[in-house]
Amino acid sequence: MKMTSKKMKDELMKKLSRPEWDFQYDSEKEVLRIEQKDSKKGINVSLPGVVAKWEVNKEKAIEEVAYYVQEALIAMHKEENSGAKILPVIRSTSFPKQAEEGNPFIMTDHTAETRIYYALDSNKTYRLIDERLLQKLELTEQQVREMALFNARSLGYEFKQDTVAGNTFYFLNTNDGYDATRILNESLLQSMREKISGDMVVAVPHQDVLIIADIVNEIGYDIIAQMTMKFFAEGHVPITSLSFVYEDGEFEPIFILAKNRKKTDGKEKG
């Protein structure tokens, strides 16, 4: 059987049929939206991507997507009822892993220097989610992660920019407590990548700033290093004094690149 986007839409609608959910199908964009009837919050599924996975994994691909959508929508509903938002926050890898003995925080690895934690934010109170709180929320770790990333993508952004020695620096500093969190917004990073002509360098020196730089020469690397160190020293919640080159969805710490460059130079001289 040849799988098409239309057939995949029908398969997913069968798997996800629930009285409290609605479906909307955009045949032009080949996107299926599944949303809650009451809140109108939902998930968009790009069908060609699921079809490509189906070509490899068959029924398992459909099961995985259906599970992801179901978990995310259930988490959204619980969050809606609790009156609080779950958002990811970036912290240093040296940040404590436990709220107290025997009660670890819910965490996800991010880069060699950073880790993702999850905050329950009700505007009045802000608390990092640990295992005990997770049980009270009646959520799974996966639901928390899906919900947090969904909410992170909804955070607005407006950059200020400055150009020094041909290098352009973009600063995000809304002071909403989640500026560094925007580093998790893949579509934001991709849109910046498209407008950048040189190396794309990203830094989160503390929780209230995100720096994205278009680096075209060695001076630019020196500037971003000094800038990141300065912000790191001044930050209320410091994260890392290192910046990262962003390429193909991966973050490479600058000091690793510098070491590699030195090794290459050494070989050439030898």
UniProtKB/Swiss-Prot annotation:
Source species, domain of life: Bacteria
Entry-linked InterPro entries: DUF1444
Any Pfam family hit: DUF1444
Similarity comment: family membership: Belongs to the UPF0354 family.
HAMAP family: UPF0354 (MF_01548)
Protein name, per record: UPF0354 protein BCG9842_B0431
Taxonomic source organism: Bacillus cereus (strain G9842)
Taxonomic lineage from the root: Bacteria, Bacillati, Bacillota, Bacilli, Bacillales
